[in-house]
Amino acid sequence: DLATMIKKCKEDFPGKKVILLAHSFGSFVSQCYIEKYGAEIDGVVLCGSAGPRLLLSGVGRVISGIVMKCTGKRKKSALLDTLVFGTYNKGIESDSAAAWICRDHEEVKKYDDDPFCGFKVTNEFFYDFLGGLTSIHKKKNMNKIPKDLPVFLMAGDGDPVGEYGKSVKKLFTSYKKLGIKDV
């Protein structure tokens, strides 16, 4: 758990600043972390992230809940995988389902060949993940982020996770509206 890892870092390196750097899925976990424990760190860098899409994540959670009830928690649904990741390769000519991950074809090949990357996740994962996205983007939770916590957002204009920059801009705007001073 992220809170445990950061606590361990602070113990191992007393007096040092702790800057949390998170990418893609980790950036969503880190958004949750800063809502709960933001005062424990000195800054956060969210890379390849996205902002509030409450309708999309809410509907996705309902669908994943139905699929989970019908087929089981531990099953892996091609439907859910397609609904979540299916459009990410739109406009990219490639045989790889993971072409969206990087512009460098050699890196995509390494990703495809790595058994720890690109695997299908369970119905329960999708249900929990989409519920988490809904939760982290509720105003009452986002408002718990310390207003003096420096937040640095990075996004690529070719990254479908952040809707090619649009959703990251929504996150920026949301944080500014909440009164976070250094975004």
Kindly give the residue locations of the regions a language model identified.
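Alpha/beta-hydrolase-fold enzymes
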Residues: 30-118
